[in-house]
């Protein structure tokens, strides 16, 4: 797949935030996943879900999430709705100017993964990740996010990701990436490019002082129907 640049609108009254979910696709850690660089920690339990305007709506399309003005309080689809068996197995973030790898995580081969007791498994496990970056991350101009993913035995048409970033529930930036068509039973690699304008010193200071109040929703669509929803939050203080 070709290298693609992020697009989409910005929230009013704020600069875009350089926090690529990490997940441009899905930088989640499954049981036994191996982090190679960067820092990721287990999230603390948060408040209960807040029911939003899309809660219970079916199907959910791109235009629905593009209208959201705050982080969602809960997941807008269940893991079972990923009928295409899309599985993100590797994720890497790098500074495009220096080539420095800022974060990388990958799943081990299926044969090396630890057995899982399905009865004890959280149904939302692997859908949330917490990132810890240094303040220098907020001054980067361009970041590349490489994702490697596999698909099941169904063709994936018009695969698209919309990723929306918020600071204190104010929309900062919306990215819109099109993966296109994926053939059945294939492994795919794609690098998305996130362009960041300079941030004001005031905003940088606020984001450093308030870790994990920068959050993102990553929505994945096939044929304009939501099939996956992941979440992330970010600290730029350089400490857990």
Swiss-Prot record:
Record's comment on post-translational modification: Phosphorylation suppresses its interaction with KLHL18 and down-regulates its KLHL18-mediated degradation. Phosphorylated more under light conditions than dark conditions. Dephosphorylated by calcineurin.
GO BP annotations listed: endocytosis; lipoprotein transport; mitotic cytokinesis; negative regulation of caveolin-mediated endocytosis; negative regulation of clathrin-dependent endocytosis; visual perception
Primary location: cytoplasm
Phenotypic effect of disruption: Mice develop a slowly progressive retinal degeneration, characterized by mottling in the fundus, mild thinning of the photoreceptor layer, and increase in apoptosis as early as 6 months, dramatic acceleration at approximately 17 months, and virtual obliteration of the photoreceptors by 20 months. Phenotypes are due to defects in protein trafficking, such as Gnat1 mislocalization.
Annotated binding of tetradecanoate, by residue: 131
Cellular-component GO terms for this entry: centrosome; cytoplasm; intercellular bridge; spindle midzone; spindle pole
Tissues where this protein is expressed: Localized in photoreceptor synapses in the outer plexiform layer of the retina.
Effect of residue 39 to A: Up-regulation of KLH18-mediated degradation
Entry's free-text remark on domains: Adopts an immunoglobulin-like beta-sandwich fold forming a hydrophobic cavity that captures N-terminally myristoylated target peptides. Phe residues within the hydrophobic beta sandwich are required for myristate binding.
Subunit structure: May interact with GTP-bound ARL1. Interacts with ARL2 and ARL3 (GTP-bound forms); this promotes the release of myristoylated cargo proteins. Found in a complex with ARL3, RP2 and UNC119; RP2 induces hydrolysis of GTP ARL3 in the complex, leading to the release of UNC119. Interacts with NPHP3 (when myristoylated). Interacts with CYS1 (when myristoylated). Interacts with MACIR; interaction only takes place when UNC119 is not liganded with myristoylated proteins. Interacts with CABP4; in the absence of calcium. Interacts with DNM1; leading to a decrease of DNM1 GTPase activity.
The protein's name in its UniProt record: Protein unc-119 homolog A
Source species: Mus musculus
Gene: Unc119
